Amino acid sequence: DTIFRIYSMTKPITSVALMQLFEQGLFQLADPVGKFLPEFKNPKVFVSGSYPHFMTRPADREISIRDLLTHTAGLTYGFHYRTNIDHAYRKVWSGPRGDNTDFSFPPLDLENFSQSIASLPLEFSPGDKWNYSVATDICGRLIEVLSGMTLDDYLSKHIFKPLKMKDTGFLSQKI
């Protein structure tokens, strides 16, 4: 009866939800993310510099939905602490007050979070490398746009309730 956060184990749940929409014919895996989230059109790749003054170059191609699902989109997480892009993610992630430095959840709604992440350069061109990242958060935003529902409502209606996962939800006030 213990309630706890499942953190990154939400990634397969989000991926299943997105693939349900794929099965409905709402997108193709090769579709550019920018087709549904305009903020991701014409991505730029980091060359040099530091936040907020980056030198960039155009990415070799657009980010595909497949890239998001396979963590090959060029995105990152702030907690890697490897690059200047990680540092920029920490700035975006911590919010205006800097009060979310444990990376436990995006401080913004998914629409604004997606726009903030898209405003930053990619670490590499889509498809070039694998990097554990916020790609699943962007998949969550895609689910919202494609389904017309918030992510938590979609997961509840199409995953948790059909599987009788009555104690599973998006956020718990009990933690």
Q: Where are the predicted features?
A:
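Short, intrinsically disordered, charge-balanced linker/junction segments flanking boundaries
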Residues: D1, K174-I175
